[in-house]
């Protein structure tokens, strides 16, 4: 198998984050080596978060200054800029909503990538923990069999073979081989502390990741709801919704900056680990595990010597020697001492079980299994995990920009709605042509209507409050009006529909139209004499 350095290569974004300046609170450069217990290194990560917090403060100051200036500025002539302001608010809200939706989409992808990376890490840690716990279980089981069960069988056989010195010598030799096996098993590393650490890390990582994933999911949904409700408030021109969403937008803006600080500092710290993970693991290895063993699992090279080879070889040879001795006693001693057969078969079964345990221990101690888990954990946290954190950082940045634009646009929408209400209410209540009078006329059809000034009947004056003038209109004039209506409209009729009932003001005539109408009146007798002959 190739070395870990060939199989695992940190991605470019890890090196990019690792090469960012590591500065402590005194503005002094610190080492970028991952060491979370070092106070200086902790300050470098906190400095990244504080720098983003400073950017958030500048952003909030800008938004606050903009809102104050917008509220304190003098009222200008809004008639010329009403359409421009409305269009600007609409486009700002639309772009902010689209930007927020794009940010949420990026955030969903980043959240999923980070979750996959942490899941791969915990899965690999659980596999490694299972392997190490299996080694400890097999070693302790084999030691117990060699110390207790074998001693009981040998004690009874010593009593049975007391008269035969050669058989007693064989039993003592097997006792010596069992001691060698116990000694070699004791020399193997005790993985109990390491497996407990792996189990604790995996459990804590799973719990933290669950709440992190759930928190971001709630944040995504909240951002989308704020954008949708803001658009709804603009569409319905609701001041209450706009005011509520203004407060929610400010809260979402602060949450976006806070998440950006957390994600960036976490990405920088994880990248520092991913650049040189072997160095950190060597420094954190418990004292009972030697550096040779750690190197064996970290690099897993075929050219590297197996640190367990000698112990396993002695174990195998001792078992083989004991099995040969038991075979000889079964062949030669059982015919003379039939009562010894049960204990000899018990020792043979114990040796067969120990040999099976030896094969399992050899397979579990091989570097390929644990090294595979190690590489999968690195790929999960350094590829998917850091990549997901970068996408989440991009989400937070875009969301901050979107909510900044949205918060700045909502007061202008408020002013536009207020100006619209003032224009709507600034009308004469006695004006029969204002919108309110038109609505009343539509909803109250039984109300007395004013007669049209242009209709034939109203020109005679039909209202009771007005004194009608003397009747000067003849039948010929009525026929003349009907014929004019026939010429211009196609059908002779009286115009009996009041203009006010239609919701339109009385007509006005330009001088040109009046001259044209008078000239047509002068020529009308000739035309009417042809149309209606006497």
From Swiss-Prot:
It is a multi-pass membrane protein. InterPro entries: Tweety (IPR006990). It comes from the Eukaryota. GO terms for biological process: L-glutamate transmembrane transport. Its main location: membrane. One of its GO terms (cellular component) is chloride channel complex. Residues 66-87, 235-240, 410-534 are cytoplasmic. The chain crosses the membrane at residues 45-65, 88-108, 214-234, 241-261, 389-409. Disulfide bonds join 274-382, 300-367. Ca(2+) binds at residues 113, 116. Belongs to the tweety family. This is Protein tweety homolog 2. The gene is ttyh2.
């Amino acid at each position: 198998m190739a070395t870990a350095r060939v199989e695992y290569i940190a991605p470019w974004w890890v090196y990019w984050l690792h090469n960012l300046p590591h500065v402590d609170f005194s503005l002094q450069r610190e080492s970028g080596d991952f060491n979370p217990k070092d106070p200086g290194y902790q300050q470098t990560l906190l400095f990244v978060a504080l720098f983003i917090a400073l950017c958030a403060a500048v952003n909030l100051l800008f938004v606050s200054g903009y809102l104050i200036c917008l509220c304190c500025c003098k009222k200008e002539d809004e008639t010329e800029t009403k359409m421009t302001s409305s269009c600007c608010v609409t486009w700002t809200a639309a772009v902010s909503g689209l930007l927020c939706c794009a940010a949420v989409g990026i955030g969903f992808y980043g959240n999923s990538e980070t979750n996959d990376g942490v899941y791969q890490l915990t899965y690999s840690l659980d596999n490694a923990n299972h392997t190490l716990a299996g080694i400890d279980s097999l070693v302790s089981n084999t030691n117990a069999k060699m110390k207790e069960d074998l001693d009981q069988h040998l004690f009874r056989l010593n009593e049975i073979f007391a008269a035969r010195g050669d058989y007693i010598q064989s039993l003592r030799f097997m006792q010596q081989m069992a001691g060698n096996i116990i000694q070699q098993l004791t020399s193997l590393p005790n993985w109990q502390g390491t497996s407990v650490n792996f189990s604790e890390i995996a459990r804590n990582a799973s719990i933290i990741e669950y709440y992190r994933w759930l928190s971001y999911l709630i944040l995504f949904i909240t951002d989308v709801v704020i954008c949708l409700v803001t658009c709804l408030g603009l569409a319905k021109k609701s001041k209450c919704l706009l005011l509520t969403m203004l407060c929610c937008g400010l809260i979402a803006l602060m949450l976006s900056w806070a998440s950006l600080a957390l994600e960036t500092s976490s990405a920088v710290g994880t990248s520092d680990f991913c650049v040189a993970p072997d160095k950190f693991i060597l420094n954190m290895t418990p004292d009972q595990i030697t550096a040779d063993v750690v190197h064996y699992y970290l690099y897993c090279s075929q050219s590297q010597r197996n640190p367990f080879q000698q112990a396993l070889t002695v174990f195998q040879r001792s078992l083989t020697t004991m099995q040969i001795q038991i075979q000889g006693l079964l062949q030669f001693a059982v015919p003379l001492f039939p009562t010894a057969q049960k204990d000899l078969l018990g020792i043979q079964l114990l040796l067969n079980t120990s040999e099976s345990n030896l094969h399992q221990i050899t397979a579990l101690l091989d570097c390929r299994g644990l090294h595979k888990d190690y590489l999968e954990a690195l790929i999960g946290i350094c590829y998917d995990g850091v990549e997901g954190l970068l996408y989440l950082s991009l989400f937070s940045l875009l969301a901050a920009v979107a909510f900044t634009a949205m918060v700045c646009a909502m007061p202008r929408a408020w002013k536009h709605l207020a100006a619209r209400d003032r224009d709507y209410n600034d009308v004469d209540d006695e004006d029969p042509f204002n919108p309110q009078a038109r609505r009343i006329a539509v909803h109250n059809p039984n109300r007395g209507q004013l007669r049209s000034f242009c209709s034939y009947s109203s020109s005679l004056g039909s209202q009771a409050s007005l004194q009608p003038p003397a009747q000067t209109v003849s039948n010929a004039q009525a026929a003349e009006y009907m014929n004019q209506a026939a010429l211009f409209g196609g059908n002779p009729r009286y115009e009996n529909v009041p203009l006010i009932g239609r919701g339109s003001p009385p007509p006005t005539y330009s001088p040109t139209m009046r001259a044209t109408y008078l000239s047509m009146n002068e020529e009308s007798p000739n035309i009417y004499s042809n149309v209606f002959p006497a």
